[in-house]
Regions:
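Conserved GNAT-family N-acetyltransferase fold
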Residues: 43, 54-56, 65, 70, ...
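Conserved catalytic-core motifs of GNAT/GCN5-like acyltransferases
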Residues: 102-104, 120-138
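Conserved GNAT acetyl-CoA-binding A-motif
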Residues: 93-106
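A short, internal acetyl-CoA/4′-phosphopantetheine-binding micro-motif in the GNAT/acyltransferase core
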Residues: 70-77
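A conserved beta-strand-loop-helix scaffold within acyl/acetyltransferase catalytic domains
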Residues: 34-35, 48, 56-65
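Conserved N-terminal entry element of GNAT/NAT acetyltransferase domains
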Residues: 1-11, 143-146
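Conserved acetyl-CoA-binding loop-helix of GNAT-fold acetyltransferases
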Residues: 78-91, 116
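Conserved active-site tyrosine of GNAT-family acetyltransferases
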Residues: 17, 114, 119
């Protein structure tokens, strides 16, 4: 069986892979289905003139908020804007069934920021990227629904 690397597979292949894993998950753990819909969103911060101060990109999936990125302009750092974006994203996530949050950050980025906002370190992967480390943190957002 030939296996090839494809950096840009067709939409049909991407869709078939997504449907395949969703079907496997549904068959294996039937009650996962209500939580499988991905909800992608952004929390955007602007100043009074509409200039971009920063943003957060997140996805709600399997009752978990995945914070994919958070960026702040230099002039917005230390002003509470990042905290507001996190709080708004977490509130949105809870409204959409999320009970926890997960984020990856690197050694030169924002681990102390996330910890200050209630995130706990799960693991550190040294040497990713080379000479640095990736940190994985999580936070409980809400009690599980019965």
């Amino acid at each position: 069986m030939p296996v090839k690397i494809d950096r840009d597979p067709s939409e049909a292949i991407r869709s078939a892979l997504s449907k395949g894993i969703a079907g496997f998950n549904r068959h294996t753990i039937p009650d996962l289905e209500p939580n499988e819909a991905e909800i992608r969103f952004h929390a955007i911060a602007t100043d009074e003139n509409g200039n971009l101060l920063g943003g957060l990109r997140g996805t709600c999936y399997w009752n978990t908020l995945h914070i994919e990125l958070l960026w702040l302009a230099d002039r917005a750092r230390g002003t509470g804007v990042g905290r507001q974006m996190i709080e708004n994203a977490e509130a949105f996530a809870v409204q959409n069934g999320c009970e926890k949050a997960l984020v990856e950050t690197t050694s030169w980025q924002a681990r102390p920021f996330y910890e200050k906002n209630g995130y706990k370190l799960l693991a550190t992967l040294e040497g990713r990227p080379k000479g640095h480390a990736s940190h994985y943190l999580s936070k409980t957002l809400a009690s599980p629904k019965s």
